[in-house]
């Protein structure tokens, strides 16, 4: 395989993966490719926008597409929580945090100023795992009051030695901003948490 073909194939594959990440899933890939070709060749005869107009259009498109996706994620999350709270063993707190006791420990409950040692696995509602101390093979330690609101509230419910499942509404997690590549705006998060100890300092 020649170097030109390698460049072509690797570049094409890269563009393909990037196009998959476009919010809203509404972009016409053929139109985008045609636009790339015109731009690369310097052919402006078929272009209906100048560069400034095109930039503004793309910015507006992305903002609107992200807003639509965030709305969809919120609607899906609200529907899930409404159904989940009716399931056996699921408890909903005043804030909207939902949890289920898998194992009830007999130790002390931490306060908001304590530091704790936990094992946890975090997933999205579709099962996508975004973080896990279990997979890393090492418990995490952090302050109860130094994490997302759902964690701060949930940890104070748990006696040491407990295993709980938490479903955390977006407003008690990362809200409208999301976090990283996996946690989209308005995402409900599921955490399986084992409270191992309250760390004495």
Language-model features and meaning:
Residues 1-6:
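Short, small-residue-biased leader/transition segments that mark boundaries at the very start
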